[in-house]
Swiss-Prot record:
Gene name of the record: RELA
UniProt-annotated location(s): Nucleus; Cytoplasm
Keyword set includes Disulfide bond: no
Ranges of compositional bias, category Gly residues: 454-463
Lineage, top ranks: Eukaryota, Metazoa, Chordata, Craniata, Vertebrata
UniProt source species: Gallus gallus (Chicken)
Keywords of the record: Activator, Cytoplasm, DNA-binding, Nucleus, Phosphoprotein, Transcription, Transcription regulation
Designated name of the protein: Transcription factor p65
């Protein structure tokens, strides 16, 4: 015998009778049906739809929906049907199945001995969506419309995941059976629908975490909707939610979330709180589980707390006596300078000379000029040829100053005095007759000899041949066709000195001096008297013979 069947035995017999005084009978629900935990089954499943449990039903003590008719005792009739959850409460397409069930509703006679009635073996059978209209039409045909909702007020859509039980009672009256006002139960939700299913939480992979929060937990549960579920942590005076996204809900049966931080993040001892699932849409909650918040294990020596105290102490010290670099407007300081040792400029290097270092330059009166041009090397001075513009046709005739400067650079590397003061050639040549000499005379002596009237071949000398205007840059035809006076050309150092000595002898044109010995080549090696002078490597005639051998063959012999 079920516990619900024992209820009439504990009730007084007079409750089934109508109380004197004319009180109106009414129906009261003693045991509400359980809202969640029952599954609506289809007819095609071929099995029983089960039994609707009572609200206080447990695994050890099962209960069922129970009603009581107040202020009445006697025969009567009772009907239980399904209506929609929301008003107006019209007939629902689903139907009740079980003992004494027909056309989708339950109907039975009331026992005259008792006024409390329990409904066992009542199950809910759902219909397919394509059969909704036919099922509703069957309810209207069988007069299964407790609230007489007209067709136009009934909605075209039905909530197939929720129903209500409607209890209708008819009692005997003076004119026969009189209906009592119908009574509705609380909604019953299909356990298959995630939006209405019963929430149930299972122990996860861990039931404790740090008081700082952020620990990852895998939680198992029944079917839930990922957009309509939360993990709630709560204690007395405190509540927080676990953090997770919709993508962290795996197939509606598992949730991966991170724990929220506890209200006291510096715990010294563990604290136990509650953890549960909550559905925001209907505020439905699951049975809670225990969760323990532990002291933070990452800072066993309380280093962060000590560092905070040190930081606060330093900040207070800086506020009392700010450092120089932390002042609001520090005084400007001059830029820092770095001493770099200075080095003397490198001495200019003289180009190598062909005959060695030249003698010291001679300055008249011992005073050097203000600015002096850089002397040309001796090799370039000896090989430089001067040509007349009219003869060579390559440029203007060189000036006397340029020729004199080049000659003096070749002799001593010095620069002549523009005033025409005599040069001390006696000290240079080691001969007293040449102590003083005029610059004009020196120019004439160093210049080429005059061309004889007969032409080039009349003189018969090699020095005369060197006085020809020669320009290696011009074509040979222009050079060979024109002869005449030309600018002086530098000769080699030994031959120029030899000509100077010959002019200063008693038989020479520049005479006046004492007789001297036979002329010698001062620049070349010594040779016996009477022997012809030997050409040297530095003599210009030897170089001229090599350079002009091909050039002289182009001139016609006169």
């Amino acid at each position: 015998m079920e516990p619900a069947d024992l209820l009439p035995l504990y009730l007084q017999p007079e409750w089934g009778e109508q109380e004197p005084g004319g009180a109106t009978p009414f129906v009261e629900i003693l045991e509400q049906p359980k809202q969640r935990g029952m599954r609506f089954r289809y007819k095609c499943e071929g099995r029983s739809a089960g039994s609707i449990p009572g609200e206080h039903s447990t695994d050890s003590a099962r209960t069922h929906p129970t009603i009581r008719v107040n202020h009445y005792r006697g025969p009567g009739r009772v009907r239980v049907s399904l209506v929609t959850k929301d008003p107006p409460h019209g007939p629902h397409p689903h139907e009740l199945v079980g003992r004494h069930c027909q056309h989708g509703y339950y109907e039975a006679e009331l026992s005259p001995e008792r006024c409390v009635h329990s409904f066992q073996n009542l199950g809910i059978q759902c219909v397919k969506k394509r059969e909704l209209e036919a099922a509703v039409a069957e309810r209207i045909r069988t007069n299964n419309n407790p609230f007489n909702v007209p067709m136009e007020e009934r909605g075209a859509e039905y909530d197939l995941s929720a129903v209500r039980l409607c209890f209708q009672v008819w009692v005997n009256g003076p004119g026969g059976l009189c209906p009592l006002p119908p009574v509705l139960s609380q909604p019953i939700y299909d356990n298959r629908a995630p939006s209405t299913a019963e929430l149930r939480i299972l122990p996860g992979d861990r039931n404790s975490g740090s008081c700082q929060g952020g620990d990852e937990i895998f939680l198992l549960c029944d079917k839930v909707q990922k957009e309509d579920i939360e993990v709630r942590f709560w204690a007395e005076g405190w509540e927080a939610k676990g953090s997770f996204a919709a993508a962290d809900v795996h197939r509606q049966v598992a949730i991966v979330f991170r724990t929220p931080p506890f209200r006291e993040r510096s715990l010294r001892h563990p604290v136990t709180v509650r953890m549960e699932l909550q559905r925001p849409s209907d505020r439905q909650r699951s049975p809670p589980l225990d969760f323990r918040y532990l002291p933070h294990q990452g800072d066993l020596q309380c280093i962060e707390e000590k560092r905070k105290r040190t930081r606060d102490t330093f900040r207070a010290f800086v506020q009392r006596a700010p450092l120089p670099g932390l002042e609001p407007n520090p005084e400007p300081r001059p830029p820092r300078r770095i001493a770099v040792p200075s080095r003397p400029p490198p001495a200019p290097q003289q180009p190598p000379s062909m005959v060695g270092a030249p003698p010291a330059p001679l300055f008249p009166l011992g005073v050097p000029p203000a600015s002096s041009p850089t002397p040309e090397p001796l090799a370039e001075a000896l090989l430089q040829l001067q040509f007349d513009d009219g003869v060579g046709g390559s440029g203007p005739p060189p000036s006397t100053t340029t020729t004199t400067t080049t000659t003096q650079c070749a002799l001593g590397g010095g620069i002549p005095d523009p005033g025409g003061s005599p040069l001390d050639l006696g000290a240079l040549l080691g001969d007293p007759p040449f102590d003083t000499i005029d610059a004009a005379e020196l120019q004439r002596l160093l210049g080429p000899p005059e061309t004889p009237p007969g032409g080039i071949g009349a003189g018969g000398g090699f020095g005369e041949l060197l006085s020809l205007p020669t320009n290696f840059g011009d074509p040979p035809s222009s050079t060979a066709a024109t002869f005449g006076p030309s600018p002086p050309m530098l000769l080699s150092y030994p031959e120029a000195i030899t000509r100077l000595v010959q002019c200063q002898t008693p038989g020479g044109s520049g005479g006046g001096g004492p007789p001297v010995g036979p002329p010698q080549d001062l620049g070349g090696p010594l040779h016996p008297p009477g022997a012809p002078p030997q050409p040297t490597e530095d003599s210009l005639p030897s170089l001229g013979d090599l350079d002009f051998s091909a050039f002289l063959s182009q001139f016609p012999s006169s």
